[in-house]
Amino acid sequence: MSSTPQRASAHTAIDVVIIGAGAAGMMCAIEAGKRGRRVLLLDHAATLGEKIRISGGGRCNFTNLDVRSENFLSQNPDFCRSALARYTAHDFIELIDKHGIAWHEKKLGQLFCDESSQQVIDMLKRECDAAGVQWCTPANVASVDKRQQFEIATDRGRFRCESLVIATGGLSIPAIGATPFGYRIAEKFGLTVTDLRPGLVGLTFGSDVLAFFADLSGISVDATISCNNARFRENLLVTHRGLSGPAILQISSYWRPGVDLSVDLAPDRDAEEFVFAARSSDKLLANVLAEFLPQRFAQRWVDANFENIPIKQISERQLREIAARLHDWRVRPNGTVGHKKAEVTVGGVDTRQLSSKTMEAREVPGLYFIGEVVDVTGWLGGYNFQWAWSSGFAAGQVV
């Protein structure tokens, strides 16, 4: 194994150029290099794998034990099936184990490094070096053209190759290098890019919603949240900015402006059965609901929506209304915090123009798109990294 990365010059013979040395790009480079292909990894950043480094609170949620196509958003929801089946979470776990990286399952199948996400970056670099991958970083790409071969002009020289792989990611977190470069290359070669928006991102709320949550910061509510046919059961956290937590991040990828979130505050019970069973009680409505909701939250919710009187004084009609509202409490966001803080970008290169088996552009032989730049977006919990590994592997078998 090489201890020093192989650096490429503009005179180096190259078969495959991969632009973007993140999770997908390095995985593709490893697999292509193993096949004896002469691979060059280009990246505009001097420090590689920054998104890996910051992920999972610095411990990298590198995959999930339960990966299915249903865990991904795309205009073509079946596109990811082939790649995910050919390189699975267990395949990546095997690679992690080979390098002696200790890991644990946190919750819901989410796997994290015991120590540091840097271990994953170092592992990928070692695998690249062992496969003979050459590096050219930092390198800024000025232009990409295709004649008989692809020609890539950079501030480090010009490179020619038979196969060009775009693994430049999305728009999320520009502070660590995200740019629209990959989308521009797709459009230059005639591919369509779908609408782009931030995903796994914090939502913002108007003054009316913020007034409701005033003084409730820190309260966590077990709830199911739904929007546009998507449903997630995770903790809902009240903050000074409104609602946050895993449930909000998950649903944000599905939310569109002007649409309400539906919150089920009683996901484990039949709310109507519960309130009718409590009818003989002298307790105030808020105190009854505090049997399964945090007391302060229950009080505020009742004060905002109903009259806080003894439940025995409430009519059957209104009890049914209370029960219905508990299962379908409507909250409308007014925006998101944007790409600068989003974990992913929803949308990307239209998958109808790519081969699901190889990631190659159907109308541009030798041009491949992998990872987040493609219109495949995973849920929170390691799914986006698995897509990076799987799509990178798929392209790496053929470039």
Model-derived segments and their meaning:
Residues 17, 33-57:
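Glycine-rich FAD pyrophosphate-binding loop
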Residues 45-48, 53-54, 62-69, 102, ...:
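An anion/pyrophosphate-binding glycine-rich loop and adjacent beta-alpha core
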Residues 137, 300-377:
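A glycine-rich dinucleotide-binding beta-alpha-beta segment and adjacent secondary-structure elements
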Residues 10-24:
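Beta1/beta-strand and adjacent pyrophosphate-binding region of the FAD-binding site
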Residues 17-19, 42, 141, 159-175, ...:
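Short hydrophobic core segments
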Residues 12-14, 154-163, 231-233:
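Core beta-strand elements of the Rossmann-like FAD/NAD(P) dinucleotide-binding domain
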